[in-house]
């Protein structure tokens, strides 16, 4: 139960940072392109890589990993988890599965979003 609490609290922090980042991007560059989301995905992926590498080198508790990686970075951007999964497959030498994962995740998510839009718009 404590581990879940760590993820929930970290996720709330990450989501709050994501919201503030998006609002800042809207004020700076306007709403015509998703600059905030793109920045969040890139920065979150960089931060995840940095954190995981430091954790692997110096060691760290599962609780710290859950709070920071799953919680904060997961709340900030799930793209960081996606990027870490891709990198893990790649570093294991599973190149084809890594690209299959990336392709299926991105295309599958976009198709699922359009299906959700279609379904919601079809409801009376």
Swiss-Prot record:
Topological category with respect to the lipid bilayer: Multi-pass membrane protein
Compartments (UniProt record): Cell inner membrane
GO cellular component, one term: plasma membrane
Matches recorded under InterPro entries: FluC (IPR003691)
Activity control note: Na(+) is not transported, but it plays an essential structural role and its presence is essential for fluoride channel function.
Record carries keyword Cell membrane: yes
Primary localization class, coarse: membrane
Molecular function GO labels: fluoride channel activity; metal ion binding
Catalytic activity: fluoride(in) = fluoride(out)
Transmembrane annotation, as ranges: 1-21, 35-55, 66-86, 99-119
Keywords: Cell inner membrane, Cell membrane, Ion channel, Ion transport, Membrane, Metal-binding, Sodium, Transmembrane, Transmembrane helix, Transport
GO-annotated biological processes: cellular detoxification of fluoride
Binding-site positions, Na(+): 74, 77
Family statement drawn from the similarity comment of this UniProt entry: Belongs to the fluoride channel Fluc/FEX (TC 1.A.43) family.
Record's function text: Fluoride-specific ion channel. Important for reducing fluoride concentration in the cell, thus reducing its toxicity.
HAMAP family the record matches: FluC
Name the record gives this protein: Fluoride-specific ion channel FluC
Gene this protein is translated from: fluC
């Amino acid at each position: 139960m404590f581990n879940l609490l760590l993820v929930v609290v970290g996720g709330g922090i990450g989501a709050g940072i994501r919201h503030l980042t998006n609002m800042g991007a809207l004020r700076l560059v306007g709403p015509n392109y998703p600059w905030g989301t793109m920045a969040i995905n890139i920065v979150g992926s960089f931060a995840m890589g940095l954190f995981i590498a430091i954790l692997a080198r110096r060691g760290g508790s599962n609780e710290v990993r859950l709070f920071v990686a799953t919680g904060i970075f997961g709340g900030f951007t799930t793209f960081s988890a996606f990027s870490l999964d891709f990198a893990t497959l790649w570093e294991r030498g599973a190149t084809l599965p890594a690209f299959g994962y990336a392709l299926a995740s991105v295309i599958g998510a976009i198709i699922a979003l359009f299906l959700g839009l279609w379904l919601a718009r079809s409801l009376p």
